Amino acid sequence: MPVHSHRYTQDLNNPALVLVHGLGSAGSIWKSLVPQLLENFTVYAIDLPGHGDAPLNKDEEMDPRSLAQAIVDYMVSEVQVEKMHVAGNSLGGWISLEMAAVAPDNVLSVTALAPAGLWHELPPRKLPPSLDARILAKISQYFMKT
């Protein structure tokens, strides 16, 4: 699976931080944060397949777990980074969590910012459904005045 990264560093001895963007974005989304991270990390901003500089192969699996495995494989085989911290937002947050699940020996920590995909069911209701109708009726009064 084609994954691409942009490396930013002041010191290659700093621990690796892999940044995973959300759907429809690219690794460049992290550029404004990179300068603050360079003092402590070598930063790898990932381009997911079909985003940024990474091509899309239509026959590849694109689910979060497959993408997570592809990023770990890419970092270990092509970049020669065995241990990494990972952070991601939205879909990238979900992929980051999956990276820790598929490669716990490689992922040192995860920061998932507003990760997608966590609600497979709606949370339990705290208020009775009948209250919805009363609230909507009250709100609609302000729009129905003539």
Where are these regions (language model features)?
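Active-site loop/oxyanion-hole signature of alpha/beta-hydrolase fold enzymes
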Residues: 7, 32, 44-87
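Conserved HGGG/HGGXW glycine-rich cap/lid loop of the alpha/beta-hydrolase fold
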Residues: 7-55
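Structural signature of beta-strand start/N-cap positions in the alpha/beta core
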Residues: 16, 42, 82-85, 106-109
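Short, hydrophobic alpha-helix immediately C-terminal to the catalytic nucleophile
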Residues: 31, 72, 97-101
